[in-house]
Amino acid sequence: MNKVVLLCRPGFEKECAAEITDKAARREIFGFARVKDNAGYVVFECYQPDDAEKIVKELPFSSLIFARQMFVVGELLRDLPPDDRITPIVGMLQGVVEKGGELRVEVADTNESKELMKFCRKFTVPLRAALRDAGILTNYETPKRPVVHVFFIAPGCCYTGYSYPDNNSPFYMGIPRLKFPADAPSRSTLKLEEALHVFIPADEWDERLANGMYAVDLGACPGGWTYQLVKRNMWVYSVDNGPMAQSLMDTGQVTWLREDGFRYRPNRNNISWMVCDMVEKPAKVAALMAQWLVNGWCRETIFNLKLPMKKRYEEVSQNLAYIQAQLDEHGINAQIQARQLYHDREEVTVHVRRLWAAVGGRRDER
């Protein structure tokens, strides 16, 4: 098995390919990416047979921006017989995976794959039973064993392989299933909700998204992102010249400040969160975010960077490198993650958490 499949947003295959090629090369793993426009996935083929396994085990999935999921696969299975698709799949996985903890039969996130997804749902039950009989899956689901992936790219045509539960997306097809809240003021609320699920471990929510925290939402109108913070019982300063939804103002938790998000300066020193979804050039937003972090105006931030039409991976990489350089220059240790979320379009979402000062004499967050 010398290939890695990476699922991505349709239309962003080139960015996904550029990223995996770059980040694999930094680990001295070389290969080439097979890219098909709007396919919703990329196949990265390694020159050395064991390198695909190295990628899915050692390249942190959390470091990838454009990939929704990542798993190692073998050769493409073609023309599966309609009367017995199971036997060839079991044959491909025998000797490759032993006692996997979960099965995911998936497709790319495209309109063309919607019919295929119906088949995948029906096919999962008999395939799971056959894989359990063959010892490829355990008799019960467990998050401690590898995930078995069967990825259909067309009827009767699939890749088979696996990923590791501590280095993959926990979500089917890499997509969290979120429901739009009827009382939210805009659909953008789902971006922040998804970001919280992707960037913050579930067992840390009560501590890091606690009742009574203070938060700032820059460019808040009409309040889609503020809504998520209010839902977590935070006190929110919503900064925007445009009006906020009355339903949010009625909670008593929101202070609306009619100011430009780029000019606003906080007057409290205990702000836990700053969030920002402003339509502006990514370099300008990155500079503002770096300013907030360097000055210690917030502990954690989630913000969006709008992408240009070309060289998107390069642009995002430069923006993240700028923020990292500013933090390094001021002796601030921080954790930076970026991801193009399912609910993002021509943008990526970034999370930065200040951890501690790298120089003596300063105490930041633990």
Swiss-Prot record:
Key word Calcium present: no
Reactions catalysed: cytidine(2498) in 23S rRNA + S-adenosyl-L-methionine = 2'-O-methylcytidine(2498) in 23S rRNA + S-adenosyl-L-homocysteine + H(+)
Keywords linked to the UniProt accession: Cytoplasm, Methyltransferase, rRNA processing, S-adenosyl-L-methionine, Transferase
Binding site for S-adenosyl-L-methionine: S188, C221, P222, G223, G224, D240, D260, D277
UniProt-annotated location(s): Cytoplasm
List of catalytic residues: K306
Transmembrane segments: none
Domain of life: Bacteria
Protein EC: 2.1.1.186
Example GO biological process: methylation
Pfam family for this entry, one: FtsJ
Matches recorded under InterPro entries: RlmM_FDX, RlmM_THUMP-like, RNA_MeTrfase_FtsJ_dom, rRNA_MeTrfase_M, SAM-dependent_MTases_sf
Gene Ontology cellular-component terms listed: cytoplasm
UniProt subunit comment: Monomer.
Name this polypeptide is given: Ribosomal RNA large subunit methyltransferase M
Gene symbol of the encoding locus: rlmM
